[in-house]
Amino acid sequence: MKKVTIRDIMKKYKNGEKIVMVTAYDYPFAKLVDEAGVDMILVGDSLGMVVLGYPSTNQVTMKDMLHHVAAVARANPKAMIVGDMPFGSYEVSEEEAVRNAVELVRAGAEAVKLEGGKEVADKVEAIVKAGIPVMGHLGLTPQKRHALGGYRLRGKTEEEARELLEDAKALEEAGVFSIVLEFVKAEVAKKITEEVGVPTICIGAGPWCSGQVLVIHDILGLAPFSPPFAKKYFDCGKAIVEAVKKFAEEVRSGEFPGEGYYW
């Protein structure tokens, strides 16, 4: 098994091949998405809402992230593991940002992701200097949704578009190996992709990026609420309910466990 590395990601980028990233938060899902052939597995702080039942990503702690990164790492995937740095884990100081990034790597992450542009460039640079690859995240940055006026499309105005491009260039200069663009106007994401020299991984930001990412629970129809840009490929939630209903019916009728299911 040849492990996917940053060299492989950059090779795909330079060859014009689309890069695929999907979230996973535990051992079995990491095994499955890796078998599907994704390039990167993102252990995202989105786990707070889709797995832990938190109202937002802001409640996710380093303890939560370390637990789930370690679970994914135990699956020993070929895909590169990217661990999210949760809210409050990198904003205070460069030293704290590096310390928490190191903890995620010790848990099994092979790169870390953090939200923000120019204002976090110093933290990005410090983490990169510590030898840890960093993925940036611009556009709809859920950890900062209150400051941005909620969950809304970014890049609709000329000023926002200019700021996003400036932020992307600042992140590139700080040393990121890629940048997630979330819920950004497609034309703006296209311009950013054309003007930076690192891959852009988009979610709800159009088809002109270097790659795409989706939350596994959105792909499978497991999330109670999915954003408008998330395509559902299978209604797994409905299938699970039907399967458990069938089990319950068979238990109550005495049909289960039938012959062959006991000794």
From Swiss-Prot:
- Cofactor notes: Binds 1 Mg(2+) ion per subunit.
> In which compartments does the protein localize?
Cytoplasm
Q: Which GO terms describe its cellular component?
A: cytoplasm
Please give the NCBIfam families that the UniProt record associates with this protein: panB, PRK00311.1
Q: Which residues form a coiled coil?
A: none
GO MF terms, alphabetically ordered = 3-methyl-2-oxobutanoate hydroxymethyltransferase activity; magnesium ion binding
How does it associate, per the subunit comment? Answer: Homodecamer; pentamer of dimers.
Q: Does the keyword Metal-binding apply?
A: yes
**Cross-referenced InterPro entries, in alphabetical order?**
Pantoate_hydroxy_MeTrfase, Pyrv/PenolPyrv_kinase-like_dom, Pyrv_kinase-like_dom_sf
Q: Which gene encodes it?
A: panB
Query: Catalytic residues?
Result: E182 (proton acceptor)
Quote the protein name from its UniProt record: 3-methyl-2-oxobutanoate hydroxymethyltransferase
The record ties this protein, via Gene3D superfamilies, to: Phosphoenolpyruvate-binding domains
The kind of enzyme this is, by top-level EC class, is transferase
Listed under GO biological process in this entry are:
coenzyme A biosynthetic process; pantothenate biosynthetic process
Keyword list (alphabetical) reads:
Coenzyme A biosynthesis, Cytoplasm, Magnesium, Metal-binding, Transferase
Report the sequence similarity comment from the record.
Belongs to the PanB family.
- Recorded E.C. number(s)? 2.1.2.11
Cofactor(s) listed in the protein's UniProt record: Mg(2+)
> Which domain of life does the protein's organism represent?
Archaea
Residues bound to Mg(2+) are: D45, D84, E115
| Species of provenance | Ignicoccus hospitalis (strain KIN4/I / DSM 18386 / JCM 14125)
Is the keyword Magnesium assigned to this protein? yes
